[in-house]
A protein has these predicted regions:
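A conserved, positively charged/aromatic
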Residues: 2-14, 145
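A nucleotide-sugar donor-handling region in carbohydrate enzymes
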Residues: 12-88, 247
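A donor-sugar binding/catalytic signature common to diverse glycosyltransferases
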Residues: 16, 137-183
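Short acidic-hydrophobic, aromatic-tinged amphipathic segments that line or gate anion-handling sites
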Residues: 18, 38-40, 133-134, 186-191
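Donor-nucleotide binding loops and adjacent catalytic segments primarily
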Residues: 53-147
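C-terminal amphipathic helix plus adjacent low-complexity
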Residues: 204-247
C-alpha cells in the first residue's frame, strides 16, 4: 500500500523534493517533468548534522541504564507481503543474535500486519543483555544510533541515517529491497547463518575502516535550506499549475 500511495501523491504534486538521485530518476521515469524534480536530500538528516540528538550519558540517566556501550540497535518490522513468514524471520534474527556478546537494544515494530508476533517474540527472548523500547523520542533514538556498534533489522534508518554516523547496518530481507544504500549497508537474507555472517562482517575492522570517508548518498544536512530556497524562487505560473506526464 505504501508504494501505491507514493505513486498517487506524485501524480498530485506540482514540485517534487527527492531524497536522492535514484528517487529523481524514478520520478522522471514515471512521467514527471524534469523541471519539477529536485534532489534536496532526506530531511531527517538535518537533525543529525545540526547535532539534535542526546549524548549517551543523558540517555543512560533518562532510562536508568548503566554502562551502555558495545551494543546493537535493532529494529525489525513485519513485512505485510510475508505475513506467514514474519514469526520465523524474527526468530531467525533472535537466534543469530545469541551468538554475540554485545548488548541488544530493541525498538519494537510498527503496527503493520504481523507486528504482534514480532513483538511477542522479542519480549519472550528478553534476557539480561537486552533492553526493549516500545518507542523513543527522536533525539534519544539518534543518540543511541550514534553510539551503537551496528544497526540491525529492516528499518529505513539503517540505510538513511546510520551512514551519517558512519555506523554499519545489517539490512535483513526484502522490506528495503531496491532502495538506494551506501557501502555501510550489508544486505542479507532471513537465514540465521546469513545474518550471523553479515553481523561479523559489520564488526570487522577492515569493513569499518572503509567507512571513514563515507558520504551519505541521502544528503548532507541542508535539505530544509534547499527546500525553502526552491519554494521562494518558484513562481506560480501556468507552467507550474498545469501538469502533464512527459512519457
Amino acid at each position: 500500500i505504501d508504494g501505491l500511495t507514493r505513486h498517487a501523491i506524485a501524480r498530485f504534486s506540482h514540485i517534487h523534493f527527492a531524497a536522492n538521485k535514484d528517487a529523481v530518476r524514478r520520478l522522471i521515469k514515471s512521467g514527471e517533468q524534469k523541471f519539477r524534480v529536485f534532489n534536496v536530500g532526506a530531511p531527517q538528516l538535518d537533525e543529525i548534522y545540526n547535532k539534535k540528538f542526546r549524548e549517551i550519558k543523558q540517555i543512560q540517566r533518562k532510562y536508568n541504564i548503566n554502562k551502555l556501550k558495545d551494543y546493537f540497535l535493532i529494529i525489525f518490522h513485519p513485512v505485510t507481503e510475508e505475513f506467514k513468514q514474519n514469526k520465523k524471520n524474527i526468530l531467525n534474527l533472535i537466534g543469530a543474535l545469541k551468538n554475540f556478546n554485545e548488548k541488544k537494544i530493541w525498538i519494537l515494530p510498527n503496527n503493520d500486519a504481523g507486528a504482534l508476533e514480532v513483538k511477542n517474540s522479542v519480549i519472550s527472548s528478553r534476557d539480561t543483555s537486552s533492553y526493549i523500547f516500545d518507542n523513543l523520542e527522536r533525539e534519544d533514538y539518534l543518540g543511541l544510533m550514534k553510539n551503537s556498534k551496528l544497526v540491525i533489522g529492516n528499518s529505513s534508518s539503517g540505510l538513511i541515517e546510520s551512514p551519517s554516523f558512519k555506523i554499519p547496518s545489517v539490512n535483513i530481507g526484502n522490506r528495503q529491497k531496491n532502495r538506494l544504500s551506501s557501502i555501510s549497508t550489508i544486505n542479507c537474507s532471513y537465514k540465521k547463518n546469513d545474518i550471523i555472517n553479515s553481523i561479523q562482517r559489520g564488526l570487522s575492522k577492515n569493513f569499518r575502516n572503509k567507512l571513514t570517508t563515507l558520504k551519505n548518498p541521502y544528503g548532507d544536512g541542508k535539505t530544509a535550506e534547499r527546500i525553502i530556497k526552491i519554494l521562494k524562487d518558484t513562481k506560480i505560473t501556468e507552467k507550474i499549475l498545469n501538469k502533464y506526464l512527459s512519457y
